[in-house]
Amino acid sequence: MKTNRLLPLLFIFIFTSCAELMQLAEQTASSDRPLSSTEIIGGLKEALVVGVTNSSSILGATDGYYKDDLVKILLPPEADVIVKNIGKIPGGNQLIEDVLLKINRAAEDAVKDAKPIFVNSIKNMTITDAVGILKGGENAATNYLHKTTYDQLVELYRPKIKASVEKKLVGNVSTAQSWNTITKKWNDIAKSLVGQMAGFKTVDIELDEYLTHKALDGLFLKIADEEKLIRKDPLARASSLLKRVFGSLDT
């Protein structure tokens, strides 16, 4: 009687073990099977979308640029002498910091519009592109996006940056107005007799153009970080496709 009662349990154990063995065998066979073109291009597209989405979300959040020293947008190098000398004037340091805050807020506002351009480029990726990216260096995917989107991003991005820096912010003053106030003060000094004798030079920089390139530099830096993470950290590969495609690089 005890044997009869144990038989069903024995069958369950056998069939369960067989199912697990079959699943393990299928996984092993899958891992040994060469990557197909469909898997490669699908995995690369998914990885790029993940990288772009994460990067846009990080930088598009409040203080995404402003409190990240790696991407924080500072005044142009040509303005270093302005910062040094304006800082000597009462309230000068606060004026500089207000401008920096508004500049970075403008970038945080504009970066949200970059994702559709990246997605369009990703959709147009060929198998040749995908294989080259998979077998390329740690920034191969980022370089692909830079090559295929940068000019379009600048063309579409600059008007948005311009609109952002002209947007009224705290105190009903825009970033562009703050920048113009600073540069005007400096240029007045530079053009004065004292300024000329000191060898000061005027600063004439298109703020929106400068900000566009700096904002995009920060975005591509974040995308590169995401790519490195997926390439090197198995835990960052959220789907089975990403695990299979990028897992092929681990061996």
Regions found by a protein language model. Give the residues of each.
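Mid-length scaffold segments of soluble, non-membrane domains
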Residues: 97-167
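Alpha-helical transmembrane segments and their juxtamembrane interface "caps"
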Residues: 59, 92, 113, 143, ...
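N-terminal Sec/ER secretory leader and immediately downstream segment
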Residues: 24-107
